[in-house]
Amino acid sequence: MLKRCLSPLTLVNQVALIVLLSTAIGLAGMAVSGWLVQGVQGSAHAINKAGSLRMQSYRLLAAVPLSEKDKPLIKEMEQTAFSAELTRAAERDGQLAQLQGLQDYWRNELIPALMRAQNRETVSADVSQFVAGLDQLVSGFDRTTEMRIETVVLVHRVMAVFMALLLVFTIIWLRARLLQPWRQLLAMASAVSHRDFTQRANISGRNEMAMLGTALNNMSAELAESYAVLEQRVQEKTAGLEHKNQILSFLWQANRRLHSRAPLCERLSPVLNGLQNLTLLRDIELRVYDTDDEENHQEFTCQPDMTCDDKGCQLCPRGVLPVGDRGTTLKWRLADSHTQYGILLATLPQGRHLSHDQQQLVDTLVEQLTATLALDRHQERQQQLIVMEERATIARELHDSIAQSLSCMKMQVSCLQMQGDALPESSRELLSQIRNELNASWAQLRELLTTFRLQLTEPGLRPALEASCEEYSAKFGFPVKLDYQLPPRLVPSHQAIHLLQIAREALSNALKHSQASEVVVTVAQNDNQVKLTVQDNGCGVPENAIRSNHYGMIIMRDRAQSLRGDCRVRRRESGGTEVVVTFIPEKTFTDVQGDTHE
C-alpha cells in the first residue's frame, strides 16, 4: 500500500517525504522531551527550598526562646515557605494541598508555639511534625521528577525505534529505487562508452529512474542505428577514398608511362587496360592520327589484336570476349588549339553512367594523352629538323669541298685531252677512263647532294611520299598512285629518308627509262617487315641492267643496305618493272629498364 501511495510521487518528492518523516519524528521526540523536561524544570529548586525550610526550622528551634533579634529568621522562613517557586512546583507536581497544609500549620500552630516556648522541649515535637511534612513534600517532588525522567527516556526509546525503522526502510528503498537502477544505468553507460549498444535497463515504475532508463534505452537504440549508418558511410567513404587513391595512382603511373621513351604501343596499351579496370567503360579504342586526316590513323585497343606482330607481348589481354550489349558509344577528342591528334572511343553499358570521379579521370587522362601525343609529334618534328639541318650541312660541305675538287679535276682532264695526238695512245685511254670515273663520281655526288637536300615538310613518311607522287605526276603527265597501308609512325624519320629516296630513285628511273603510262607506289606491312613496291607498265628493265655504270640501281641497293634490308629489281610478267624493298623498322626502347613495367 505504501508502495502504491509513493509510486505517484517523484524520486525527489519521495526523498523529501522520507526526510520530512525523519524530521517530524525527531521534532516530535524533541517536543515531547522538551515538554517533559520543562515539567521537571524547577523541581530541584523546589526540593532545595523544602530542604532549606528544614534547616531553618532547626535554626529557629535552636534559637528558642525567641527574641526580637530572631524575627528576621522567622520572616526569612515565612518567605521561603510561601515562595512562588515552591508554590508553582507543588501545583505542577500535584503537591499543592500538601504545601498549603504545611503553610497553614506553619502560620497557625508552629509560629505561635515558637513564640510562646521558653525552652526547646516544648516545641520540639511541633518542629519534628513540620519537618516530617516537609519530607513528604520532598518525596512527592522526587517521585514526580523520576516519573517525568522515565517518561522522557521512554519517549527517546520510542523515537529511536521509529528512527531505526525509518532508516531501515530508507536503506531498502534507496537500494530498490536508487542503487540498483543506478547500477544498471552505470553499466549501460559503460557499455555505451565501449560501443556496446545491446544492453538495456530494466527499471520498473514511473519515477525518474524508470524514465531515465527508458530514455537511455531509446538513446542506445538510436545510437546503434546511427553507428550502423555511420559505419556504412565510413565504409562508403573509405571505398571512395581507396578508389580515388587508385585513380591518383593510376594517373601518376599513366603520366610516368606516357612520358617514357618506350614505343607508343608499350605506353598506351597498359594505360587503356588500367582505364577499363577503373571505370565502367568497355571496348576502349584509341585512334592516333598520322596527320589531321582522320582516315589515316593507328588504333590501340584493349582487345587482343590478332594482327599484332609481337605475339609474346602481354600488354593486351588474351582470351577476352567483347561485351555482347554494345551500349552507348562515347567519344573524347585528343586535340589542342592547333592540331587534332586522335580520338578516344569507348562503350558504356546500357543503363549505366560514369560517376563524377570517373568522368574526371577520363578527362584528365584525355589531357595527358593529348599532351603526350603533342610532345611526341613535336619531338618528331624537332628530330626531323635536326636531321634535315645535319644533311644540309653535309651537303654544303660536300659541295664546297669534293664537288669543287671533282670539277677542278674534270677541267684538268679536259685540258689534257685537248692536246690530242701529242699524247701517247696509252695516255689518251687512261685519260678517257679517268674522265669516265670522274663523271661517275660526279653523278654519284649529285645524287648524294640531292638526297641530303631532300626535305620532309610534314612529319611522317606518308606526307613525303604523297608530295613526291604529286611531283612526279606532273613530270609523267598522269597521276602516280600511292597505296599507303602502314600505321602512323611505324618507320623512324632517319629510315624514312632512305625509303623516300629509294622511292624517288625508282620513280626517276621509271620516268627516264620505262616509258610507262601507269605507276603505282605501294607501302605495306608484312608481319614485322615494311615492304615498298614501285611498279610500272613500261618496257621493263633489261636483263643486263646491273652493270657498273647503272648508278640508280646501285644507289637503291646501297640505301636498302643502310636500312638493313633487301632491294630487288625485276621485270614483271605482265610487263613493266617492279622495285621491291623490304626491311625491319627500328624500335626505340627506353634507356632505363622498368620505366614502363613498374
Curated annotation (Swiss-Prot):
Encoding gene (name): narX
SUPFAM superfamilies: ATPase domain of HSP90 chaperone/DNA topoisomerase II/histidine kinase, HAMP domain-like
Protein name per UniProt: Nitrate/nitrite sensor protein NarX
CDD domains linked: HAMP, HATPase_UhpB-NarQ-NarX-like, NarX_sensor
Keywords associated with the record: ATP-binding, Cell inner membrane, Cell membrane, Kinase, Membrane, Nitrate assimilation, Nucleotide-binding, Phosphoprotein, Transferase, Transmembrane, Transmembrane helix, Two-component regulatory system
Protein's GO biological process: cellular response to nitrate; cellular response to nitrite; DNA damage response; nitrate assimilation; signal transduction
Compartment annotation: Cell inner membrane
A molecular-function term among this protein's GO annotations: phosphorelay sensor kinase activity
Membrane-crossing segments per the record: 15-37, 152-174
Sequence ranges assigned to domain Histidine kinase in this UniProt record: 393-587
Modification Phosphohistidine occurs at: 399
